[in-house]
Amino acid sequence: VGGIVDANQNVHNLNSYFTLNANKKFGDFAVTGSIGNEFNSNHSFSSSVFGYGLVVPTFNNIKNALTYVPSTGTSNTKLFGVFADVAVEYKKFLSLNVKARNDWSSTLAADNNSIFYPAVSGSFVLTEAFSALKNDKINLIKFRASVGEVGKGAPAYGTDSYYVGAGASDGFGPVINFPFNSQAGFTLSNTAGNNKLTPEFTREVSFGADLAFFNNRLTVDATLYNRNTRNVILYVPVSGTSGVTSALQNAGKLSTKGLELLVSGTPIKT
């Protein structure tokens, strides 16, 4: 009657982040830049034993069970990235920012594990370029635009197919799990891996404006964006006659468009 589980999980994460920054002025131009690298190593291990059919009720010990079903799980992933960032500002009213990053992910096959994604953004402050526009009523008029990408790898071990503990059922009675009658059994997982997976990318284009009025007592922040994700990594159903029921593929696209508007005000100030 009843059951018990004895489980253990260990997680080890190692992260390092290094940057080198510099800045310099050239007349009316101010230039800042940075380069760096990032390293992430993630390891987890879990083990458990499920016991079924307790001999003595309420005696919570795994040895009190008639049958045992052991299981383990492990995950090791690594990611190494390098990046660079350069920003140029002219007379505090015109700016341009260029970024680039390249990651190498262990969750993708060696031929496809490089993930490069750049980004460019710029802004123009109208009230700084034309100081006559700036007064007690109009404090800030700023326009901005950006386009950039973000990439990521696949789920851990998604590039290969693996064997898992076997089980059987007729749909009416209880499920028979191995080991059974002192015999171990394994079967190919119902999910097929895919060593042709490529990185998943999300590109976003945005245009916006920042406005401030009446000595900054009324501010408006508006952003119009268009976000598209390609090569979405999904578990896709496949015919069971192939020996599996799903396969990991670059099979999806997502598109999002929207307007973000934030209005803040201080109607009464003492």
Regions found by a protein language model. Give the residues of each.
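Extracellular/periplasmic, surface-exposed regions of secreted and cell-surface proteins
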Residues: V1-T270
